[in-house]
Amino acid sequence: MSHVAVENALGLDQQFAGLDLNSSDNQSGGSTASKGRYIPPHLRNREATKGFYDKDSSGWSSSKDKDAYSSFGSRGDSRGKSSFFGDRGSGSRGRFDDRGRGDYDGIGGRGDRSGFGKFERGGNSRWCDKSDEDDWSKPLPPSERLEQELFSGGNTGINFEKYDDIPVEATGNNCPPHIESFSDVEMGEIIMGNIELTRYTRPTPVQKHAIPIIKEKRDLMACAQTGSGKTAAFLLPILSQIYADGPGEALRAMKENGRYGRRKQYPISLVLAPTRELAVQIYEEARKFSYRSRVRPCVVYGGAEIGQQIRDLERGCHLLVATPGRLVDMMERGKIGLDFCKYLVLDEADRMLDMGFEPQIRRIVEQDTMPPKGVRHTMMFSATFPKEIQMLARDFLDEYIFLAVGRVGSTSENITQKVVWVEEIDKRSFLLDLLNATGKDSLTLVFVETKKGADSLEDFLYHEGYACTSIHGDRSQRDREEALHQFRSGKSPILVATAVAARGLDISNVKHVINFDLPSDIEEYVHRIGRTGRVGNLGLATSFFNERNINITKDLLDLLVEAKQEVPSWLENMAFEHHYKGSSRGRSKSSRFSGGFGARDYRQSSGASSSSFSSSRASSSRSGGGGHGGSRGFGGGGYGGFYNSDGYGGNYNSQGVDWWGN
């Protein structure tokens, strides 16, 4: 049976002419390429091709005068001063000298960057020359330059009030009660001041529950939606506890190792992450929440020059963010000791196992000098926790609390999911039409399955005149960081990515995720669409579907239905047909997302929980949803219907949201 959208090829330009998408802002014409135009790595050695142009008029190339790699602190300080930090004074800036910067400011851990500014090793040295009696809970003098750099960017979102409708479930013995505001739990002057500087007004659901659990020194396994504020959920209570307790034996061990020529660092807290990008993002968040403290965060990851990372470590390290492979390397070189590690965090734990890091993780946690479970405080965070991961938690966690916050990866309120039938041969044309309709300030993330496909699609878009970039596993660390910075800054508002970017990347203002190639499993789909709609922002996820994606049909339908998304009838028909054919093989009829959660606590044999926090989702259903596709079955109303007919699965504007920024 051939499932062909019969009108897909008819008059795309004419169909879009009537969509009133503010065509003046969406013209594809432009002038010839300027000297400053970003050129993809695989095209840099080619002779310039005639006809390349920048879309200055449509916003594809940034018109900002500011250099893309300039400091975050370039904007004026219009926040107003924190009421928690009342001792600001201009004379304090002398404590922070200028840091040497790498080319990619905001990425962290490279060049001569020391994280918070270097200090001379004299009487004012901050990191390890202080005595044990120093009060780590008191804030150090401020630095206006550093404050502006750390806190000048970012958007905390506009949709936090809708988080109250997300269901939450906590299981385990004696679960601490959740909080409603950051002030409900004592975290100290430094943390509260930095929360205000970060402009966090209220905790997200995962923060409401995880912060008091961690503050009570309970081990935690948290299954939370992507973009839910997981990083702050563990950094805030860990850092506040370090400020309250001080360095303890770790500082003494570093002093014994040599005051000036120390070679080994003993971090108090260790955060493991699967990818370089996620590790750097966690590190950048740690820099914010350790501002004006004596805690110095560091980051180590593979794919970068190890000598510079060693030199950065030797300046002091209290909180270490690391990828497993590079951390094992540092431990074997004698640069890192885990003897006094009080806090262990495994972020994106399922992804680390998927990537084959289990031997390294067990080497770090079980076969070295790290304190055993019950002595250390351990937390596991992930977007999915299948039973295999939960069983692994038995080895790492002690009397833990299992926390499930919302159904993983998509919320009906924040991410609108659209699925359209597109034959392989038509995908590029469909993509161009989507990009032409996109607002000039919108960031678009396009996912493909292969590295070759990423390069090929970036090459195609580049020749079509779009300012785009790409990221995948074969790119050098420098090229990956440059691509991410070009995307974040808006100079290249289109990022073509493979799965390497699907996990953990926190780019807060991504408006649109496009699955140019759908993944083969639903978990990967969940993580991809989670790149938009992050931390309260509204997002749109569009997926190109055809016969190659039959295997994901049933799970995709289950997810769309549970998220209260509009479902095209052809997808329902395909799911029924595929499910019926596969039923003889024992395929389960229940949704893997049943109950609104991405995972369940395997310890609950009967479904009863020790404690539960829950609230119902918003009851209002999506508009539309009837008569999908009409008599054409899988064809729908052609690509014009992609925007305004039920053949696509609903009208983009049915939510009253202007997705295109016009």
From Swiss-Prot:
Its main location: membrane. The modification N6-acetyllysine is found at residues 55, 118. Transmembrane segments: none annotated. Residues 414-575 form the Helicase C-terminal domain. Residues 536-661 are annotated as: Interaction with NXF1. The modification Phosphotyrosine is found at residue 104. The keyword RNA-binding applies. It catalyses: ATP + H2O = ADP + phosphate + H(+). SUPFAM superfamilies: P-loop containing nucleoside triphosphate hydrolases. There is a cross-link at residue 215 (Glycyl lysine isopeptide (Lys-Gly) (interchain with G-Cter in SUMO2)). This is ATP-dependent RNA helicase DDX3X. It comes from Mus musculus (Mouse). The gene is Ddx3x.
